[in-house]
Amino acid sequence: MRRLLWLVAVLATLFPSLAAAQELSLSLGEGGSISARTIQLILLITILSLAPGLAIMVTCFPFLITVLAILRQGIGLQQSPPNMLIVSLAMFLTYFIMEPVFTEAWTTGIRPMIDETVGVELALQIAIQPFRSFMAARLDPNTFHAMAALRPGGDAIALAPDAPLSILMPSFMLSEIARAFQIGFLIFLPFLIIDLVVAAVLMSMGMMMVPPATVSLPFKLAFFVIADGWSLIAGALVRSYMT
């Protein structure tokens, strides 16, 4: 109770105009009360805390982070680039790819809600529509129908942007991860060939006690740098969403 009252006091200090407004109050017993606006603020904070997870589910972030993680493992580096750098790169590439979708959602839904020309519920429905179209265009039909079949009566649900989000979102994530594994296989192949060549050379020289991964690592790094691997992979990932 004390923590709740302390939170209300802090919010009243930060938002004096809201605190001074006449609003509906709810009695908590023992002389405590909490306003409806405070409840709205608490709900807003809760939604904001879930925003990163929502961003992962409806954007290309799962695909990008999976491919980059497979790339690092294929080279043979365990901690370099560090996880924070990999995640940051995936986030900025996500922003680059998703910027048209973000702009459309802001223009058609969020901005009118801020200008109070449409209601909150309608604005959210309009804002989520660009993400629905993005997910519907990327997901695998077989995955979608397999997920829909798990729901009672879901066989009649068609693959469309207006499909239920409870089916559209997991189908999109599974499709993105499967596509990332396919690309990861292609990325892994040249590094696997280098490992096999180095292992064969070491065996022919009788150096069976030398770990092939240790010897092949400099060659894989040199191959990746000479081929300008980061630019090639980043460009290929971005272009895969432009088609």
Residue ranges of model-derived segments:
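Hydrophobic alpha-helical segments and their helix-loop boundaries in membrane
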Residues: 20-243
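N-terminal secretory/membrane targeting signals
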Residues: 1-21
